[in-house]
Structure formats: C-alpha cells, structure tokens
C-alpha cells in the first residue's frame, strides 16, 4: 500500500531550557512543586508587571545554534502569539515569529537497519528551518476536580526552545532517529535535562502523504505532545496508515491537530489546525529586540564542550568504528567518556572489541536494570582488564561473560576483580597443546559417529565435536586452538 505513497514528516520539538528561573521572570523552574507555588506576578499577568529577558536562556539558544551550524541572529524580536486558553493568563504567549534567534542549521542522523523491511542502515542530513525562544503555558488539571478543571501556573513562563525541521523525513524511523539525535545533543550541551516523562523534551509531528512523484505536499495533520520515542514512532505509523486508507477510500484529509492515545495506539482529532494568521502575531511592545553581538557568541562558543558529531568522526577515523557504532557510543556524554576510558587502557587495537562489549553485554545489563552508564557496577577499568584477558588468551569470550556478570552482581570495587575471580574460580583458559590434544583424543574416541559424518562432508559434525571438547573442559579450552588441533587430527 505505502509503495504508491510518499510520507512527508516535519518535527517541532520543544526543549525546556535548564535555567533556574523562568524566561521573563525570576520565579523558579523546579519541577514537582505544589501547584501555583512557583508563579510570580509576571506569570500571573497581574496589571503593571513587565517581562525581563533571562540571559541564561539566550545563551543556551546560542549554544544550540552553534552546535548545528546555524546562523545566530544578531538581532531578533519577540512577538505576541494571541490565543485564549485558561492556563495562559495573559491571553497571549510570548514567542518569536518573523525573526527567530536561530536560523537554519542541520542535524546528521544515523537511521538503523530494518530487518523486516530489508533496508540497511544509512546516514541522512535533516535541515532545520529555525529554533526560537518562547515561554511555556501553564497546565490544566482535569482529574483532580469533579466537574471542574484546576489551573497550575508553575510551568507558565518556563523557557522553551522550539526547534523546527524542514519537512524532509520520509518515515517514522527517520523521525525517531532525528528525535534521538536531537535529544542527545541538547542533553550533551547541558541546555536541557531531556526528561521526557516530565515534559522537558516533547515533539509535535506534522505528517502528510502524497503520491510518489508528486511535488505538491499533501494536507498535513499535527500530532501534539509526543513525550516518548516509542509514542512518536507509533503515532506516525498510525497516522500514515489512517491518511492513506482515508484517501484510497475516497475521503479527504483535513488539516487538524490530533492527539495520540497510547492505550489504543491511535490518533484522534483534537481541533482544526490553526494557521499563523489565526494567532495575530505582532511584536511585543514590552520587550526590546534581542541583540547578540559577535563577542557574546564567541564567549559562549569558547565554553562549549566537544560536540557528539566531532567525537563520532574521531571514533570512526581513530578506532575504525562504523558511523552507526560511533553514533551509539555517543548517545550520552557519560557513554562516550566510559568508552574512551576503556580504550585508553586497552589501546586502539582493541577499540572495536570494546565497542562490541559496550553495545552488547554492558548495554544489555544496563537496560535490564534500567541504569545509566554512569551507574554501571562494572567500571571502565574493570571492563578494560576483562577485555585484556580475552586478548592475551587468559580467558575465553564465554568465560569473560561469566566473570562480567560476577563483577556486576557482587558490585566489586577493586580494579583487579577479573584476575581475582579467575584465580578464585580456576577459570584460566587451557592453552597447553599437550593437554588439549589429550582431551581431543578422548572426544574423538567417544564420538566415532560424528567423526565419520564429518569425513563424509557434514560440517555440522565438526561443530558438534568442538562442542564436546569445550564441554569436557567446562568451557575453558582455547576455542581457536581446539579448532586447529581438531582439524589436524581429522585430516
């Protein structure tokens, strides 16, 4: 069905900036306070109050602009976006419209392979239209009051950076890859804590479809407030199916705002989609134009950390990693630091093995226990020694997994935990040729049927013999040596 249709997706992402106070007032931005305890007269829109720009919010916007190679506007203006909603006391939202603080820029994404669709992993550049500063609205509480709605203005005035892409993504997988890359970037920079459950990072997806080859865009629907990568993927996939089925059944897609219901895994209509003219934007007379000179930009630039994309390129050139692996290992600053700490002890020759372990065994355990790499019970030094013992032939890969789990479970703090466990449990790999030959002779004598099958051309029989040899040594035999000696004796 979808082969006849092209999907067009653009994302608008709201990143809550990690300032201690709000964008136009001195009220706290701390999450979780009792309702309406962090709303000052400015947030309440009391008569006579005036907004004052938060310098920290501006500097975080500058950092983002520099990180994506965008133009940081030397002069931008704030506008009033007029609409009525109970949790918006002023009757308008202070935002930016005609001249945003960040203009253009791009984000490079790594889209993973899809085995079901038989598509390989690939890289794509997503161009950004703009990123602008604005204030968040308050929150309506429907469930706490019978037949009424409560208003919590703690969130009103919280600084947001709204990041808008061009409509260049062509699948839910690309949209998720972009959102994850953007999430990594803003948390890496420290401009947003990225907590999706608390609403610090949320996406609106604009989705439309058009016949393949058609230049004109189809009618789009906007899916609001998607606060998890899974919801983003599911919402887009459902919306694409809905629109295609609607058109093929003779219907027409309506421009509207929709919400995603994660329980039913479907989108539902919320309201008709507004256009810019519906908001009656005009410059806010209470705020001077935002002027950012070159010296300010340079100072902010000098304080920025090394960016994920630069580290990814270094991992590819120095360590021979694939772009996809490098992208995974820079999913957070802590992950990249952990990996580099392991490689610094192991040496570049074992960089790929370190990457495989970090993306495999380590990540598997972290996910199982819902831990961040910074909280890993196995330190980078412990993992480096473990991998060193594989490299020097002291232990096999299978035994290494057992030792890794032992260190993890006992939460060992000594760097030499690997060597201690090897000695205590007698796990040292058997590499003595004479000892291995004796074991192999016993295996061959006890498994004549497998020997005959192998000599008859059945390779599976050889694997069975290796398995028997490893079983006889309780997994401690050097697999490469067993393979070599077994083939010699069978030739």
From Swiss-Prot:
Pfam family, one: GatB_Yqey
Enzyme Commission number: 6.3.5.-
Ranges in coiled-coil conformation: none
Gene3D superfamilies, sorted: 1.10.10.410, GatB domain, N-terminal subdomain
Gene Ontology molecular function: any one: glutaminyl-tRNA synthase (glutamine-hydrolyzing) activity
Any one Gene Ontology BP term: glutaminyl-tRNAGln biosynthesis via transamidation
Keywords: ATP-binding, Ligase, Nucleotide-binding, Protein biosynthesis
Catalytic activity: L-glutamyl-tRNA(Gln) + L-glutamine + ATP + H2O = L-glutaminyl-tRNA(Gln) + L-glutamate + ADP + phosphate + H(+); L-aspartyl-tRNA(Asn) + L-glutamine + ATP + H2O = L-asparaginyl-tRNA(Asn) + L-glutamate + ADP + phosphate + 2 H(+)
Enzyme class: ligase
Subunit-level organization: Heterotrimer of A, B and C subunits.
Family listed: Belongs to the GatB/GatE family. GatB subfamily.
Functional description taken from the UniProt entry: Allows the formation of correctly charged Asn-tRNA(Asn) or Gln-tRNA(Gln) through the transamidation of misacylated Asp-tRNA(Asn) or Glu-tRNA(Gln) in organisms which lack either or both of asparaginyl-tRNA or glutaminyl-tRNA synthetases. The reaction takes place in the presence of glutamine and ATP through an activated phospho-Asp-tRNA(Asn) or phospho-Glu-tRNA(Gln).
Family annotation (PANTHER family): GLUTAMYL-TRNA GLN AMIDOTRANSFERASE SUBUNIT B MITOCHONDRIAL AND PROKARYOTIC PET112-RELATED, GLUTAMYL-TRNA(GLN) AMIDOTRANSFERASE SUBUNIT B, MITOCHONDRIAL
Protein name, entry field: Aspartyl/glutamyl-tRNA(Asn/Gln) amidotransferase subunit B
């Amino acid at each position: 069905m979808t082969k006849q249709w092209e999907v067009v997706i653009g994302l608008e992402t709201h990143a809550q900036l990690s300032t201690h106070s709000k964008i136009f007032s001195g009220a706290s931005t701390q999450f979780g306070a009792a309702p309406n305890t962090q709303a000052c007269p400015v947030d309440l829109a009391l008569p006579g109050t005036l907004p004052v720009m938060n310098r920290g919010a501006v500097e975080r916007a500058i950092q983002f602009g520099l990180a994506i190679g965008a133009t940081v506007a030397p002069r931008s203006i704030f506008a009033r976006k007029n609409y009525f909603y109970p949790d918006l006391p002023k009757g308008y939202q202070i935002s930016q419209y005609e001249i945003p603080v960040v203009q253009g820029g791009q984000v490079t994404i790594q889209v993973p392979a899809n085995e079901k669709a038989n598509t390989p992993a690939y890289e794509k550049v997503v161009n950004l239209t703009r990123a602008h500063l604005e204030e968040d609205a308050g929150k309506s509480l429907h469930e706490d009051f019978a037949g009424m709605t409560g208003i919590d203005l703690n969130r009103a005035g919280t600084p947001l950076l709204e990041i808008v892409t061009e409509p260049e993504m062509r699948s839910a997988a690309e949209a998720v890859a972009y959102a994850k890359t953007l999430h990594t970037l803003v948390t890496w920079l420290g401009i947003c804590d990225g907590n999706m459950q608390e609403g610090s990072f949320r996406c609106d997806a604009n989705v439309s479809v058009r016949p393949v080859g058609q230049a004109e865009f189809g009618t789009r629907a906007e899916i609001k407030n998607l606060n998890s990568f899974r919801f983003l993927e599911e919402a887009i996939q459902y919306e694409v199916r809905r629109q295609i089925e609607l058109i093929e059944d003779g219907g027409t897609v309506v421009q509207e705002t929709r919400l995603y219901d994660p329980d039913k895994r479907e989108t539902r209509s919320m309201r008709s989609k507004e256009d810019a003219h519906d908001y009656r934007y005009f410059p806010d007379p209470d705020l001077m134009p935002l002027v950012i000179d070159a010296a300010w930009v340079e100072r902010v630039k000098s304080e920025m950390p090394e960016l994920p994309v630069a580290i990814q390129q270094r991992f590819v050139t120095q360590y021979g990693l694939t772009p996809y692996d490098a992208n995974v290992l820079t999913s957070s600053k802590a992950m990249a630091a952990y990996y580099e700490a392991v490689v610094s002890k192991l040496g570049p020759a074992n960089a790929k093995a370190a990457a495989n372990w970090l993306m495999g065994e380590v990540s598997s355990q972290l996910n199982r226990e819902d831990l961040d790499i910074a909280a890993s019970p196995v330190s980078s030094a412990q993992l480096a020694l473990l991998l060193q013992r594989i490299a020097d032939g002291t232990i096999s890969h299978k035994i290494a997994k057992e030792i890794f789990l032992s260190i993890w479970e006992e939460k060992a703090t000594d760097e030499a935990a690997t060597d201690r466990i090897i000695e205590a449990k007698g796990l040292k790999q058997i590499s003595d040729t004479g000892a291995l030959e004796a074991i192999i002779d016993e295996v061959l004598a006890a498994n004549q049927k497998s020997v005959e099958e192998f000599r008859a051309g059945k390779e599976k029989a050889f694997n069975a013999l290796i398995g028997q040899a490893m079983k006889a040594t309780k997994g401690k035999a050097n697999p490469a040596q067993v393979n070599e000696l077994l083939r010699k004796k069978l030739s």
